[in-house]
């Protein structure tokens, strides 16, 4: 068998169960490579429930910066028995399949054309942790530590990321570092490291940052002068307002009184949310809402009101698959006509289409300027893929000329 061998050029896919804390560990892996200067493109593929169903996290690593998804998986790491048959089937010939071998692999899944690597993740957790919740959470961190040995990831980069993430919280840094060490030392002692696929430090990232579009939108709204947000939670747009609130708490505070200079209202439905935004705009505040396809359907009548009455209104539409309630955790760009001609009668709405987190930030701020200048609704169109996944992006820049 000829193994796949490469440096800084591969696709790895993590197979987990959602609600088990795997997202943080997988994100730690992607950020470690990025901090080593290697371009990465992570994609989170998750179900529309809270806990218990298969979820995947796919990372394309490419030193030349080719970050679109491609066919075939070079490395699969599976800790979910529900999806293991699918996961091992997706591995390219010569690739690597890593799994929790506390329980033996079903012989019907065995392949002679790939390298199969077992890690006793459950056993290591059972031996080192008494709390069932800790066993589940740290299992994910242990396999990241093992990957550090298997792929030759700089271990200091991983521990540095943990220190940044849990700054000032030694009670969290120490156990997570210990879990990384468990996986790292086990792999070094029991498996030939590194694999044929490995990483090494690079300078191809430059000044780029790793950021999701929704966070960039929240920052853009803040930068654009927004002081009012009214919304009804809907995947995949919810984290837009979460980000806006997170940063508004830092900068929208009156230095004299300590009072907040912003308002965020979680409305009872989408109709109320857009109504509050229009009302706030009518009173002179820069205001916005964030929603997805089903919300657009419900907000259309109010968008017609804002269009007819010439009220500046900003709406961020993070699109998902439809129609009807559709598939909340799958991406699609299917709301374009619904937004372009939102509401009945002769309407032609202004749409903005960012393609990167930097453009989400810039267009997010621009939306408020355009709405005020044109006295009309402005709808900014992104999608789940851009909104909820980390993307390499040019750094966000503050313009001192902006008032």
What residue spans do the PLM features occupy?
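Active-site cofactor/cluster-binding pocket
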Residues: 1-224, 228-230
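Thiamine diphosphate
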Residues: 6-91, 228, 235-339, 350-371
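Glycine-rich phosphate/pyrophosphate-binding loops
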Residues: 42-44, 154-158, 232, 291, ...
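Glycine-rich beta-alpha junction loops
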Residues: 103, 320-322, 374, 383-388
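Short, well-ordered, mixed-charge alpha-helical segments that flank or form enzyme active sites
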Residues: 105-108, 125-127, 150-152, 238-239, ...
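Conserved anion/nucleotide-ligand pocket segment
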Residues: 133, 138, 149-151, 358-361, ...
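Conformationally flexible catalytic loops at phosphate/diphosphate-handling active centers
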Residues: 186-199, 203, 378-403
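Short, flexible turn/loop "capping" segments at secondary-structure junctions
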Residues: 342-345
